[in-house]
Curated annotation (Swiss-Prot):
GO (cellular component) term, any one: proton-transporting ATP synthase complex
A Pfam family per the record: ATP-synt_ab_C
Lineage of the species this protein comes from: Bacteria, Pseudomonadati, Pseudomonadota, Alphaproteobacteria, Hyphomicrobiales
Record membrane topology: Peripheral membrane protein
Name of protein: ATP synthase subunit alpha
Length: 509
């Protein structure tokens, strides 16, 4: 038998070298039961609320219910591979997602994993999904406009940077279309070099069909808008915990821009589905149900999410995060639980109606029920000057239109009011994917409120608008530029605009 001394000494040296090293300790628990996307785990005594845990199969979960003898874990993935008796280990980290400019142009799931097949995400940092909203001191009141490119919104229900404006309506009333047009309207700013004008877009799709999300992404891509957008998708086929988490993940990604002195808008489409997913999780975790079987903290779920949208003061970098949550109502019932909750949290709502949609008023905004509680402070002076009248005139028109159904013989003043109102309603219609710049909206609305549309038949209003815009873009680009640069309609610009509109109105027909 050949004994090699060198070999033995090498083995001994190796053993001596490793002597006294601590074994790696991970805290583990055991699965007691699993089903419906919920696992009950025994033994994770020191686990934190909201901590990520990992199952043997590699699937991750989040500890939500910390009870005396077990932990209720919601599973971010399929629970088919998880069996009773398997071990579960703590990760020691609260749920976080990658954030940064590297996510722009990408489609990710609720945990920030790419689902668009374009390779791994290059993130600058990771952030917790559920953090406290900024306090009162670092904030500043909303004062800059967030242009949507839609006449009916920018003129009547203006939105400011840092505001939370709810888009509410039944299914198929064009809620997502408003959000999509808002994203497309940011393209000119991103083509320019002014960093402050740029608005990054985050779109969170919750509980939607995959085909719908794919179509949305394709429209963004075709219009060159995906490069400044992030899409977070938790589709209908994803587990409820993913649908619950997606808005928080999107918010963390949006907060990166807010906290670094940039501006972002986040669209939650839609929060009704997030509430349903949260209700499902809560009931399976045996939390006591409340009104409409939602858990008692469903208000807190939405308030803590929407409070994170803010306009920061100069000391905090002057960034902003604007939120456009979407809520789907059933048969125009705004008094249901979730709609009333979100209406009370947000700074105003854009109310869309099925009847208007089918009458051909698109976007189908009900101007009477829609409000913006803080947006008027952010409206540009030029828009304020022309849009001030339109609100009053439309309100009178609605009142008179209801009244005129009863009487046939109307006096001239009432008839004039009805004519003006029907033309202004026609003027506020706008086809999809054609957002207008602020200065173009000002010119068009100026023509409407100053009576230049009154002699024109209602069905020719659209042609008048197109013609006027073509004239302005072609021969009077300097006038549009003056309004855009000053954000005001000076006496000189107003006189010039009056001349252009008058001349065009004479030649039109």
């Amino acid at each position: 038998m050949d004994i090699r001394a060198a070999e033995i000494s090498a083995i001994l040296k190796e053993q001596i070298k490793n002597f006294g090293q601590e074994a790696e300790v991970t805290e583990v628990g055991q699965v007691l039961s699993v089903g419906d996307g919920i696992a009950r785990v025994y033994g994770l005594d020191k686990v934190q609320a909201g901590e990520m845990v990992e199952f043997e199969s590699g699937v991750r979960g989040m500890a939500l219910n910390l009870e005396q003898d077990n932990v209720g874990v919601v599973i971010f993935g399929v629970d088919r591979d998880i069996k009773e008796g398997q071990t579960v280990k703590r990760t020691g980290a609260i749920v976080d997602v990658p954030v940064g400019k590297g996510l722009l142009g990408r489609v990710v799931d609720a945990l920030g994993n790419p689902i668009d097949g374009k390779g791994p995400i290059v993130a600058s940092e990771r952030r917790r999904v559920d953090v406290k909203a900024p306090g009162i001191i670092p904030r500043k009141s909303v004062h800059e406009p967030m242009a949507t490119g839609l006449k009916s919104v920018d003129a009547l229900i203006p939105i400011g940077r840092g505001q939370r404006e709810l888009i509410i309506g039944d299914r198929q009333t064009g809620k997502t279309a408003i959000a999509l047009d808002t994203i497309l309207n940011q393209k000119p700013a991103h083509e320019g070099s002014d960093e402050k004008a740029k608005l990054y877009c985050v779109y969170v799709a919750v509980g939607q069909k995959r085909s719908t999300v794919a179509q949305f992404v394709k429209v963004l891509e075709d219009n060159g808008a995906l490069e400044y957008s992030i899409v977070i998708a938790a589709t209908a086929s994803d587990p409820a915990p993913m649908q619950f988490l997606a808005p928080f993940s999107g918010c963390a990604m949006g907060e990166f821009f807010r906290d670094n002195g940039m501006h972002a808008v986040i669209i939650y489409d839609d929060l009704s589905k997030q509430a349903v997913a949260y209700r499902q999780m809560s009931l399976l975790l045996r939390r006591p149900p409340g009104r409409e079987a939602y858990p008692g903290d469903v208000f807190y779920l939405h308030s803590r999410l929407l409070e994170r949208a803010a306009k920061m003061g100069d000391a905090a970098g002057a960034g902003s995060l604007t939120a456009l949550p979407v809520i789907e109502t059933q048969a125009n019932d705004v008094s249901a639980y979730i709609p009333t909750n979100v209406i009370s949290i947000t700074d105003g709502q854009i109310f869309l109606e099925t009847d208007l949609f089918y009458q051909g008023v698109r976007p189908a905004v009900n101007v009477g029920l829609s409000v913006s509680r803080v947006g008027s402070a952010a409206q540009t002076k030029a828009m304020k000057k022309v849009a001030g009248k339109i609100k009053g005139e439309l309100a009178q028109y609605r009142e008179m239109a209801a009244f005129a159904q009863f009487g046939s013989d109307l006096d001239a003043a009432t008839q004039r009011l009805l004519n003006r109102g029907s033309r202004l309603t026609e003027l506020l219609k706008q086809p999809q994917f054609s957002p207008l710049k602020m200065e173009e909206q000002v010119a068009v609305i100026y023509a409407g409120v100053n009576g230049y549309l009154d002699p024109i038949p209602v069905n020719r209003v659209r042609a008048f608008e197109d013609g006027l815009l073509a004239t302005l873009r072609g021969k009077h680009a300097d006038l549009l530029e003056a309004i855009r640069a000053s954000k005001d309609l000076s006496d000189e610009s107003a006189a010039k605009l009056k001349g252009v509109v008058e001349a065009f109105a004479k030649s039109f027909g």
